[in-house]
């Protein structure tokens, strides 16, 4: 239950911070216009907005396991490629950043690692 209380307190702080400045969210009401797409890992320790000090609307973020970008194929799931296409073609981002990190949990589960460390 403590997690939920922490989320509620955090959301309340967010609302207080952004609502005390009446124009803070005005531009966001008009839609999103980020200039950067960040492809990052879904690891809970690596939050692109928190790490870069960005405000809401500054970056468009795609997160997945190990920040992998699978090749676009007709029979492949469209999640990552669709998000990238939306960012590039729809939002017209100026840059793409792939945000990697150390101690990647996926590598702990890789077949090679599993054979060495049963």
What is each stretch, according to the model?
Residues 1-78:
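Short, conserved "active-site rim" segments that organize catalytic pockets and cofactor/ligand binding
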């Amino acid at each position: 239950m403590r997690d939920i209380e922490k989320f509620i307190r955090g959301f309340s702080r967010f609302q207080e911070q952004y609502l005390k400045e009446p124009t803070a969210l005005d531009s966001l009401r008009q839609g999103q216009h980020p200039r950067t797409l960040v492809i990052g890992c879904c690891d809970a320790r690596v939050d692109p907005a928190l790490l870069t000090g960005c405000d809401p609307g500054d970056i468009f973020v795609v997160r997945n396991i190990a920040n992998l970008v699978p090749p676009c194929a007709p029979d492949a799931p469209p999640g990552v490629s669709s998000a990238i296409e939306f960012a590039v073609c729809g939002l017209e981002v100026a840059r793409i950043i792939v945000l990697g990190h150390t101690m990647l949990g996926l590598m702990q589960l890789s077949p090679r690692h599993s054979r060495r460390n049963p």
